[in-house]
Amino acid sequence: MSDNLRSRIVTQGSQRTPNRAMLRAVGFGDNDFIKPIVGVANGYSTITPCNMGLNDLALRAEAGLKSAGAMPQMFGTITISDGISMGTEGMKYSLVSREVIADSIETACNGQSMDGVIAIGGCDKNMPGAMIAIARMNIPAIFVYGGTIKPGHYQGEDLTVVSAFEAVGKYSAGKIDDNELLAIERNACPGAGSCGGMFTANTMSSAFEAMGMSLPYSSTMAAEDAEKADSTEQSAFVLVEAIRKQILPSQILTRKAFENAIAVIMAVGGSTNAVLHLLAIANTMGVELTIDDFETIRKKVPVLCDLKPSGRYVTVNLHQAGGIPQVMKMLLNHGLLHGDALTISGQTIAEVLQDIPDEPPANQDVIRPWNNPVYPEGHLAILKGNLAAEGAVAKISGVKKPKMTGPARVFESEEACLDAILAGKISAGDVVIVRYEGPKGGPGMREMLAPTSAIIGAGLGDSVGLITDGRFSGGTYGLVVGHVAPEAFVGGTIALVNEGDSVTIDAEKRLLQLNVSDEELATRRAHWTPPKPRYQRGILGKYAKLVSSSSLGAVTDVELF
């Protein structure tokens, strides 16, 4: 059977003479029209260090595809730099870009009848955007992560971009001077690669490796190391074989694969954004997955890796300690992974992990032994209560007190909140509420890294809570609760909180509660009026109109008709 199952529609027969004529102009020869055409979705961009090394990887992917007997066709996808847009109106486009990336890959691959695709991405939304497209198309596909940045260094300490965000809070609190602030800025990001802790990009790449959609070890490699380029070329060979065997995403992205991904995310201390993105991918793939599934798995899986933002190490250290395969082998041995789940190579998870040691190396403490975890349970807790009937996500790693009750400090935007923190107007015991930053209300669920980093930098990380219908960066830690649903814009209870109201965050009881009577809430709800959309044209206007609740993954194609 021919391997060009889809592309033959544009390459075979006399009627396709004009099609072949154009393909000859881009490098096809007489013998190439029976080969599978494989897309190379290249996220290269000089917008961000996360993506600036991707073109070299795309060229290696092209070379690998040609050597394996396929015809590559490269096309570009966009990216937004979360780190650069953070704290600005531009961050509203970040989650939107996930949908644009998905739409663009789907459009290019289906429009050109490609037989498969190798997607190469770096910054946060590149990963879920690509995987949503892969799930929509259900053609053989593999994801290549651009790799992590190496840590910066200053005064004997490893730095990440989060160090720079926290330095702003320290500077505002008078803890560091101009010279130290500038030194941290100059040293935080030393080269190419995605943000170096177990932030969102590294979390999602780890999840994809756990799901079998990326090659072993590839999710923790440094962007600038030769092994990353070698792994990319190997990914091309694996993909062509998957095309020949017709190994499809629907065979890999099963319920078992999602449960494996959640277990790994808990074990490595991953980002809250993984909840949103995995829900979106599952929704697209038609896999039943709810926000409650994260809580079920959280209770079973310990945090095994001592990684930033709340821990000591960065992702290259995890790679040196055995990477995601080592973590997965430990989970498999304790019955917390589905070993029979399929991977893109055609092997099962158990077969991939067969030769991995049962325990991590003794001469490191990045990956902790099973009997001495960083935390006995997972760190991403799903909270519910009258403030979040559909659920909210709390990241409780690095938190000394997982519960608090305090007066609400209410802000209608991230900017207003940050100004108050930097002006010293937030005190220990306060519960900060940032609302109208949800999928529809923002729109786009901006990440609150600037406010949370300012809180940490001011020394209030253990004594101030923050609740939002927006999101958090993977670099955030502290007593923070995001993804509150229903969001304020659609009349969720978070819209009804008044300044000074008593609010409870209790991660132990998984409770998020506004401590006012039902009668008072009913009165406030009766007087609440929906705000006008902030944008009524352009992509933000379209997004706000189409996007679903964060509890469903904030996807834009649910119940379109």
Swiss-Prot record:
The entry marks the following residues as binding Mg(2+), namely 82, 124-125, 447
One of the entry's Gene Ontology molecular-function terms is: magnesium ion binding
User: What does this protein need as cofactor?
Assistant: [2Fe-2S] cluster; Mg(2+)
What pathway does the UniProt record associate with this protein? Amino-acid biosynthesis; L-isoleucine biosynthesis; L-isoleucine from 2-oxobutanoate: step 3/4; Amino-acid biosynthesis; L-valine biosynthesis; L-valine from pyruvate: step 3/4
Q: What SUPFAM superfamilies does the record tag this protein with? A: IlvD/EDD N-terminal domain-like (SSF143975), LeuD/IlvD-like (SSF52016)
**Stored Gene3D superfamilies:** IlvD/EDD C-terminal domain-like
Q: Which residues are involved in binding [2Fe-2S] cluster?
A: 50, 123, 195
Q: Which family does it belong to?
A: Belongs to the IlvD/Edd family.
Q: Could you tell me which NCBIfam families the record lists for this protein?
A: ilvD, PRK00911.1
This protein's name: Dihydroxy-acid dehydratase
Recorded name of the encoding gene:
ilvD
